[in-house]
């Protein structure tokens, strides 16, 4: 999907229309987990082995990482080391293309900021999940009054930064939790 929707369209004239250069596609080794360190070795579309640190990061102002696993954390470190801006997007399909990527991110950022300000300083939050059988499960997350963070999807200006797409989330790192959560994830 990334090849069709991004690489081919960029190569078929979108780069020229935008007044940009680049638009190449590279593959890197799967990390098999979100936000894990990425191996330095990568490959171009002809299969030539390259180095992310030597051949990719220093050569581009903007990097879009479309992958199976989130690369936001490792690329945030690399963007500060090498001075690029970019976005990560794990999981790409028609639903995301036609919804989460088809919105005005200035409005998304504004809405997320309102929620972030309202939730900053909260000691705890409680979330109720109603299941298909009308049973309600409650999870309580303890936040210790921390400042809420937001994923706004924007990287304006020249400051090295990585956005996570699609965006609009407001999030915390809970210090503890109690209750029931209806989904289970592997470690």
Describe the role of every protein-language-model region:
Residues 183-187:
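Internal helical hairpin/lid segments
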Residues 1-180:
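Active-site bordering "gate/hinge" segments
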């Amino acid at each position: 999907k990334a090849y069709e929707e991004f690489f081919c369209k960029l190569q078929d004239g979108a780069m020229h229309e935008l007044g940009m250069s680049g638009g190449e596609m590279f593959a890197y080794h799967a990390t098999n987990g979100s936000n894990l360190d990425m191996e330095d070795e990568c490959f171009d579309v002809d299969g030539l082995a390259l180095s992310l640190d030597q051949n990719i990061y220093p050569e581009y102002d903007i990097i879009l990482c479309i992958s199976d696993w989130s690369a936001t954390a490792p690329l945030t470190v690399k963007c500060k080391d090498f001075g690029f801006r970019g976005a990560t997007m794990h999981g790409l399909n028609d639903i995301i293309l036609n919804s989460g990527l088809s919105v005005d991110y200035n409005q998304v950022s504004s809405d997320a900021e309102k929620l972030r300000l309202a939730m900053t300083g909260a000691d705890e939050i409680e979330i109720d999940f109603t299941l298909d059988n009308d049973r309600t499960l409650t999870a309580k997350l303890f936040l210790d009054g921390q400042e809420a963070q937001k994923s706004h999807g924007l990287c304006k200006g020249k400051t090295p930064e990585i956005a996570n797409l699609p965006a609009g989330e407001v999030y915390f790192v809970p210090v503890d939790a109690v209750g029931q959560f209806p989904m289970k994830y592997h470690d």
